Design a protein with these regions (language model features):
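Hydrophobic, aromatic-lined core segments that form the binding pocket/scaffold
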Residues: 1-209
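Cysteine-cluster motifs in flexible loop/terminal segments that predominantly coordinate metals
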Residues: 209-221
Length: 221
């Protein structure tokens, strides 16, 4: 996505040991997450912003944190639901609610159960905000099924299969493969290109294979 590189940089700036000490406090998780994203650098803002900023400054001093440069984030051509603020707020809420998240995901046997774990939400502030400041119509900011499915394809399935290989657990590998075959194929320009060549793309397993073929045999030429 547009902010894929920015989120990778952000993830490397998140001190998980420090965050884990404050897992039971969503406000403090938000302070670290937004602060490390460089989004709390402005001096002025609404009441919630200023509270987060003060909390981040305290935690940054406590854990010797250094934020990323805010210039990495992109907003043009993004729908409000995809703004970095909303995604970070959703991740903070998921981290807060989902203790032992990986073990939870390994225990789930259906896509519905996995979607329910990942669907998340946000703190109350983000119900009627897309960024800090101006309010919007109240609307819960949960992930759509299509967004959840992309998360499952690119994160959960990959983790389950790799962990299954690492542990020699064929059941985990089989479950990961079954999830891919149950999910609809991605709809992007790579898959549309393959379809134009006459290939049948039945499920996400097919689309992932075709994306990998393009990366290995087309992009490297």
């Amino acid at each position: 996505g547009l902010n894929g590189d920015a989120f990778e940089i952000w993830a490397k700036h998140i001190p998980l040991r420090a965050v884990d000490k404050h897992r039971d406090n969503l406000f403090q998780i938000e302070a670290i997450f937004f602060g490390q994203a460089g989004i709390l650098a402005d001096k002025d803002g609404d009441e919630y912003y200023l509270k987060l900023k003060r909390e981040y400054e305290y935690l940054a001093h406590k854990f010797s944190l250094t934020p990323m440069d805010v210039s990495h984030w992109r907003f043009l051509r993004l729908r409000p639901n995809n703004f970095p603020h909303i995604r970070i707020a959703q991740l903070a809420c998921l981290y807060h609610r989902s203790y032992h998240l990986l073990s939870q995901l390994m225990e789930k046997n259906s896509l519905k159960e996995i979607r329910d774990v990942l669907r998340g939400g946000t703190s109350e502030y983000w119900v009627n905000h897309y960024t800090f400041g101006g309010s919007s119509i109240s609307r819960p900011k949960t992930l759509s099924d299509s967004s959840l499915d992309l998360l499952v394809i690119n994160t959960v399935v990959t983790f389950l299969y790799a962990y299954g290989i690492h542990k020699g657990d064929e059941r985990l590998c089989a479950r990961a493969t079954a999830f891919l075959e149950e999910l609809k194929p991605e709809n992007n320009y790579i898959i549309r290109m393959w379809k134009q060549c006459g290939l049948n793309v039945a499920h996400a397993g097919d689309s992932q294979a075709l994306i990998q073929l393009k990366k290995e045999y087309c992009d490297k030429k």
